[in-house]
């Protein structure tokens, strides 16, 4: 009986750990989706900007500066305080590559989440069965 109780505790702890891992993965997927959305918005913005055109540059919540685009180049951060100048087309290609990488990461995360959800369901069923057996054994003793 004591082995059964210990087994139940271990499985309950494993179930809790699996649930925490699933929440972490779901949080990562949410972050990936938000980043993808931000990158897609950047791509649309860059595609619509033309040289010699006036635009608004966001500098804070609800604060914009009027600016004139002088050419079709952008500065891209590659490391801390290191920037590389690239054409809008190159930037768009780099951003599209980032979206592809994020798509792969999202799919991997979804696959892991699905596997973990199946493991959680199986462990939960197993735990419920063992709890019922323990209750039946307890009832027989009484």
UniProtKB/Swiss-Prot annotation:
Q: Which UniProt keywords apply?
A: Chaperone, Cytoplasm
Cellular component (GO) terms are: cytoplasm; prefoldin complex
Does Chaperone show up as a keyword for this record? yes
Which family is this sequence assigned to? Belongs to the prefoldin subunit alpha family.
What are the recorded Gene Ontology BP terms? protein folding
Q: What is its main location?
A: cytoplasm
| Protein origin, superkingdom | Archaea
One Gene Ontology MF term: unfolded protein binding
- The protein in question is named Prefoldin subunit alpha 1
| Signal as UniProt keyword | no
Function of the protein: Molecular chaperone capable of stabilizing a range of proteins. Seems to fulfill an ATP-independent, HSP70-like function in archaeal de novo protein folding.
- Where, by residue number, does the polypeptide cross the bilayer? none
Tell me where in or outside the cell this protein is found. Cytoplasm
The protein's gene is named pfdA1
HAMAP family the UniProt entry points to: PfdA
Whom does it interact with, and what assembly results? Heterohexamer of two alpha and four beta subunits.
